[in-house]
């Protein structure tokens, strides 16, 4: 007779946990204040806007003074994702995957015209018409490319949004599923359509 105890399955944790949801209003203010001034940023740099992002992080503009810590080791350590540059349909699944690897609560700044709506390449067959077709965006920074001061203004707008954020409002609505956001251009081929079928393989 097997006497091995059955493993106890813990309930699936909610995104923020019951304690964070039940926190009194003053505690929520403290939580929002902490998130607001300790944003580890992950830059998904795709084009010339990424150069302006780097300029904003250097000594002249220095967005560290706003509480934004640049160059997180990876998406799993990041709170803020800045998408800067042209997002192509082939790159879209990678953007979505990196976004999903970020822990909650997470924020996205769309930096530049290409990231906002496709920019000068909007009519190309291979360009995604805005990163908000793939992931939710919190702040849009217009420009082609935007100046570093524009990114600083976008960061301040995001911090204002975080300061008045309610956890129930942010996480009350379900996020779109990954399947709903996949492009037909990047779907794997159906089974039996590749090499080795009856037409191309040995008979």
Swiss-Prot record:
Q: Name one GO cellular component term.
A: respiratory chain complex I
Q: Which source organism?
A: Streptomyces avermitilis (strain ATCC 31267 / DSM 46492 / JCM 5070 / NBRC 14893 / NCIMB 12804 / NRRL 8165 / MA-4680)
| Functional description taken from the UniProt entry | NDH-1 shuttles electrons from NADH, via FMN and iron-sulfur (Fe-S) centers, to quinones in the respiratory chain. The immediate electron acceptor for the enzyme in this species is believed to be a menaquinone. Couples the redox reaction to proton translocation (for every two electrons transferred, four hydrogen ions are translocated across the cytoplasmic membrane), and thus conserves the redox energy in a proton gradient.
| Predominant localisation class | membrane
EC assignment: 7.1.1.-
**Keywords in UniProt for this one?**
4Fe-4S, Cell membrane, Iron, Iron-sulfur, Membrane, Metal-binding, NAD, Quinone, Translocase, Transport
Q: What is this protein called?
A: NADH-quinone oxidoreductase subunit B 2
UniProt superkingdom: Bacteria
* GO molecular function terms noted in the UniProt entry: 4 iron, 4 sulfur cluster binding; iron ion binding; NADH dehydrogenase (ubiquinone) activity; NADH:ubiquinone reductase (non-electrogenic) activity; quinone binding
Binding of [4Fe-4S] cluster occurs at: 48-49, 114, 144
**UniProt KW Oxidoreductase keyword:** no
Assembly and binders: NDH-1 is composed of 14 different subunits. Subunits NuoB, C, D, E, F, and G constitute the peripheral sector of the complex.
Q: Where in the cell is it found?
A: Cell membrane
Give residue spans, biased composition: Gly residues. 193-203
Query: Per the UniProt entry, what is one GO biological process?
Result: electron transport coupled proton transport
Query: Disordered: where is this region?
Result: 167-203
The cofactor required is: [4Fe-4S] cluster
Q: What's noted on cofactor binding?
A: Binds 1 [4Fe-4S] cluster.
Family membership: Belongs to the complex I 20 kDa subunit family.
- Stored InterPro entries: NADH_UbQ_OxRdtase-like_20kDa, NADH_UQ_OxRdtase_20Kd_su
Known catalytic reactions = a quinone + NADH + 5 H(+)(in) = a quinol + NAD(+) + 4 H(+)(out)
Task: Give membrane topology per the record.
Answer: Peripheral membrane protein
Record keyword Iron-sulfur present = yes
């Amino acid at each position: 007779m097997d006497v091995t105890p059955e493993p106890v399955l813990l309930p699936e944790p909610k995104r923020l946990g019951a304690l964070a949801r039940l926190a009194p209003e003053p505690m929520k203010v403290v939580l929002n204040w902490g998130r607001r001034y300790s944003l580890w940023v992950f830059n998904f740099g795709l084009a010339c806007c990424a150069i302006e992002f780097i300029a904003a992080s250097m000594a002249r503009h220095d967005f560290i003074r706003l509480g934004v810590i640049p160059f997180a080791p990876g998406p799993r350590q990041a709170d803020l994702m800045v998408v800067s540059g042209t997002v192509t349909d082939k790159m879209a699944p990678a953007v979505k995957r990196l976004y999903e690897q970020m822990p909650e609560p997470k924020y996205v700044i769309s930096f530049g015209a290409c990231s906002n709506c496709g920019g000068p390449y909007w009519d190309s067959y291979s360009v995604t018409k805005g990163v908000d077709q793939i992931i939710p965006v919190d702040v849009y920074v217009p420009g082609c490319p935007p100046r570093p001061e524009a990114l600083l203004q976008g960061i301040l707008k995001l911090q204002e949004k975080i300061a008045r954020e309610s956890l129930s409002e942010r996480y009350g609505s379900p996020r779109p599923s990954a399947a709903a956001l996949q492009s037909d251009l990047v779907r794997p081929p159906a089974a039996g359509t590749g090499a080795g079928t009856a037409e191309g393989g040995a008979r």
